[in-house]
Amino acid sequence: MKENFNISKLKNGLTVLTYNMPYVDSVAINLITKVGSRYENSEEEGISHFLEHMAFKGTTTRTAKQIAEEFDEIGGHFNAYTGHEKTIYYARVLSENCDKALNILADIIQNSIFAEEEIAKEYQVILQEIAHSQDNPDDLIYEKFYSSVYKDQPLGKPILGASKTLSSFTKEHFLSFIDKHYNAGNLYLSVAGNVDHDKIVSSAERLFSSLKQGEKSNFLPAKYIGGNSFINKDLEQTTLILGFEGTPYINLERLYRTQLLAIIFGGGMSSRLFQHIREKLGLAYAVGSYNSTYSDSGVFTIYASTAHDKLELLYKELKTEITKMTEKVNEEEMIRAKTQLRSNLLMAQEKVAYKSEEIGKNYAAFGKYIPPEEIMEIITNIKADDIINTANKIFSSITTSAIIGPNDLRGF
């Protein structure tokens, strides 16, 4: 509900958003930085993620151990993650400890010291993270897949970066990146739960006043390119991914049409892919579809794993189902998909962590809060013909494929 939502902008330009949920005892805090891997140039690849790691390694007032101990002392859960377009630092604590959590988050964002010995240690940690990813067939195939979808573009590069660039980063590199992107105009503080907006604003003014004013960071437009790739790996099954140009999140009507398409086609146990590929033909255990979305681009993805000798049949059946999806959608499918989507969205509204991230991401993306009632109206007004038209648009785009399996399947 709109009356629970409040927004203020500090003198330095920092946006403070709150959503009051008086029936809970906790708060979720998100500090959203509008910068991620797609903002990096070729010499910076991996720095957004590396910086996120370094934020917890000590400040001018706290050691890394003290940061961890202080959060444990208030029973808090805190962490951070890096995406293509945002880096998010978050905490969840009891309402009575909100100010203490804000104090720690403000400290690590503004006062990290980037000690050279900590940089060297964390470099080794990230190398292990990369190695773990390379040993994971799912991570490996999706990395290859996106390198074809967004060939030679930041969106097509791994968020973790590569050892060549990671090994070059020094304290000066991190401080320069912070100076460029971690300014008040590019940050959003969002808090949801049992929260008093005026108190949050007062705390933010005290804790974030040293943030300099600045502009929002920009990136180059993404261009869907597509292509085919193959990874030779001896596994029990072969995994196939098919991709098409999807929908960006900036257009909500198109976005939710695509979301409904993904649900009908491969989003659940009653979906077409699950019923046909798994239940009827027994070709795959895991099969489905979804839309990955960015501010100016999107990728509609179909995935399935099968026995090596069934790959050709799987591909043929997937193509047949794609064709059928462009021809007809029945009312029962529409009702199920809308109910599923509405249920997921509305049930998520009850979680403080979701709500805090939602209001922050809404404002970072659209410059406003989009209440769930508005989303529900969009979903309600979508017709079967809208889904068919969306399917035709998406599936007529260039196909991207990625396969991981034994070498004799190359070029099947």
UniProtKB/Swiss-Prot annotation:
Its EC number is 3.4.24.-. GO terms for biological process: proteolysis. Its cofactor is Zn(2+). GO terms for molecular function: metal ion binding; metalloendopeptidase activity. It comes from the Bacteria. The active site is at E52 (proton acceptor). Pfam families: Peptidase_M16 (PF00675), Peptidase_M16_C (PF05193). PROSITE patterns: INSULINASE. This is Uncharacterized zinc protease RF_0338.
